[in-house]
Amino acid sequence: MLAGPDADTIRARQLPGATLANAGAGIKIGIIDDGVDQRHPFFDPSGYTMPAGFPRGRAAYTTAKVIVARAFPPPGAAWKHAGAPYDPEESGHATHVAGIAAGNANTLANGARISGVAPRAYIGNYKALTVPTESGLGLNGNAPEIVAAIEAAVADGMDVINLSLGEPEIEPSRDLVALALDAAAAAGVVPVVAAGNDFEDFGRGSLGSPGSAADAITVGATTSGPSPAIAGFSSSGPTPLSLRLKPDVVAPGTSILSSRPDGWGLSSGTSMAAPHVAGAAALLLQRHPDWAPAQVKAALTVTARPLASADGGAGPTRSGAGLVDVSAADTPLVRPVPTGVSFGLVRADTLSTRSVTVEDAGGGAGAWNVAVELSGAPLGTRISVPPTVSVPGLLVLDLLAGAAEGEVAGAIVLRRDALSRRIPLWGRVEVPKLDVSGARTLVRPGVYAGDTRGRPALVTTYRYPEVPPGGPVTARLAGPEQVFRVRMRRPVANFGVVITQRGPGSRVEPRIVRAGDENRLTGYAALPLGQNPYVDEFGSPVPAAGALRPAPGVYEIVFDSPTAAGAGAFRFRFWMDDVTPPRATVVRRTVRRGDPVRVRVTDAGSGVDVRSIEATVDGKPVRAQLVGDEIRVSTTGLERGRHSLRLSLADYQETRNNENVTRILPNTRTMTSWITVLRP
C-alpha cells in the first residue's frame, strides 16, 4: 500500500527542476465537489501569500491556501447547510480529492509523510453538491448548480478544474454540464473529470457525463503500486450516446491516502484518479504557462504509457491512451488533433475514414513512421494508414469493415528513432438485427397492449451500455421482440414506457433504441432500473425505460424477454414530456379511527409509481396503499384528535431522472394536511 497521492507512478517528480518546495506554485486548481474543509492540516496556509484579487466567495471559509469558497445550492434548498461552502455533517469527498491534487508537501498523515501531486498550488472550493440523497450517495447537485460552479471557476481565474463527479450521459447537444466544460476549455481552463466507477455493473459504454465532454481530460483508474493495472470498477468507453473514445488517460485510483474532515483515510475510485491528473496539469502549466487546455490534454495523452494486462493490453475503452507520464508530457514533440479516434458504429462491409492533424509541439517537425497496433478486431476488418506522416501534416485512417461484428481497438503509433507517440482508436463493426418492418407507431401518450409470442427472436444483446452477465439488469434477452416506434419531431424533456401488467408467464422487459439499431440504446435511461440518486429506489429494478432530453428523431421501444418461454402478453403506458408530479387531493380530512384517509391521485403522464408512496402521521411512518385512483392511509392506532399527515409520491418518470434534469425531483409530489380522527 502506498502512502498518499501516487505522484511517483505518474512520474510527476521526474520533471526537470521539480521539487516539492515549488511544485505547482502559482497555479490555481478549482475543486467542484461537495465542499473542501479549509481547516485541514493538508491545507495549512503557513508560508502562502493570498494572491492579488483574492479571497473570493465566503471569506470566512478561505485561507491563503484555499483562496475561493463558494456554494451553489438549488433554489429553495431546505437542507440547513446547503448554502455553506463546507457542510460539517455531509462534506468529505472534496477534502480527499483536493488533498490528492494539491495537499501540502511532507504533511504527516497516519505516521507517514505525504504530498499532493502539485503541493504548492492554490485550491478553489466550489461546492456544487449541496443536497443530501436518500440513496446514501452523499451530497449531490443537478446540472444548473454544477454549471454555475464551472462558470464561477472560470470567472475566478482557475487554471485547472477537477470534477470527481458524474451521471449517465444524455443527448450530447443538450448536456448542459458537458457543454459547460467544453466552454471552460475554450476560455483557457483545463477541465479534468473522473470517468466513473460503473464497469463491473454496466460494462462497456458505462462512461457517462460530464466525462463525455469532448474537450475534458477524462480519467480512468488504475491500481496503485509498481505494477499498475486497470481498476476493476473503472468505467469503460465508448460514451453511450455520443460514442466518443473515453477515457483519455488513467491514473492511480485505489487505496489512496488523503485528507478527510476527521483526519485521514483511504479511498478508491476514479474520483481519486482524476485529481492526480489535475495536479499533473498544474505542473505542466507551471512549466508551460502559454499552453492552452488542448495542448495540455494532447501532451498528457500522446505520451501516456500503454498498460499491460493478461490479454496483452488494457484496451483504449478502459485505459484511453494509457497511464499518465508527466515527465514525458513535458516534451510531447507532437500534438494530435483529436487526441483519440472514434469510428463509432460502422456497418459491415463498408469503408469509414477519419483524419488526425499532427502538429509540431516543439522538436517534432519532420517525418515519423506510422503503424497501427490493434488489440482486437473482428475477422476481415482492417485499418490502413500511410507508412509515414510529415509533421505538421494530416494523417488519414481508413477502416475497411469486414462481414463479422465486433470491436476494433488499438492505437496509431508514431515512431522516430527510439521515440514513439500513441493515438488510441476504437470502433465497432455492426450488423443490426432488430426487425422494425412491422413496428407500430405510437402517435400519442396512453395505455397500449402488446404480445411478443410468435414474433421473431433476432436480438440478444443491447448496447450501450453493454451490461455484463450478473449486472443489475438482464444482460441477454434471447426471447422474441415486439417493436413500437416513436417519431420525435421536436426536443422534449423525456419520453418513456412502463409495463403496467403482464400476462401469465410473461417476463417481457422494455428497452429503447435509436434509429432501429439495438447498438444505440438511449443510455442508462433505456434500462429498467431506477436511475434517480435522490430516492431510495436508486439502482433497483423498475419496469420502465425511457430517454432523457432526447434529440428529435426516430426511436424504437422494444419489448423482449430473457428466453422464449418468457414471451407473452403485456400492457404498457407510454408518456412524453412528463415534467409534473402526480396530483393528490385529500377526499375527507375527518375520519373514524380505523378507517383510512383517502387521497385521490391522478397522473396524466407516466403514472403513479406505487413504490414511491410514503406517508407519515405526526412524523411517524404509517401504511399507505394505492387502490385504484386512491391512496389509502392507515389510521390504525391513532389517538382521537387532530394529526399532521405528510404524503410523498412520484411517477415513473422520476425513476428515469438524474442530475442532468434542471430541477431536483421534478416528478415528486409532497403534500401536508391536517386530519381529524374520531372515535370508531
List each language-model region with its residue ranges:
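Noncatalytic accessory or regulatory domains flanking protease catalytic cores in secreted, cell-surface
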Residues: 403, 507-574
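Substrate-binding/access-modulating region of protease and related hydrolase catalytic domains
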Residues: 23-25, 125-215, 226, 239-244, ...
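Extracellular S/T/G-rich loop segment that most often corresponds to the catalytic His/Ser-adjacent loop
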Residues: 59-77, 208-282
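Subtilisin-like serine protease catalytic core
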Residues: 18-142, 156-159, 186-188, 212-216, ...
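C-terminal subdomain of the subtilisin-like protease fold in secreted/lumenal serine endopeptidases
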Residues: 249, 286-363, 422-448
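Surface-exposed binding patches on compact interaction domains or structured appendages
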Residues: 309-311, 327-340, 362-398, 505-510
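Hydrolase catalytic cores
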Residues: 98-102, 128-129, 159, 250-313, ...
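Acidic, Ser/Thr/Pro-rich low-complexity intrinsically disordered segments
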Residues: 468-531
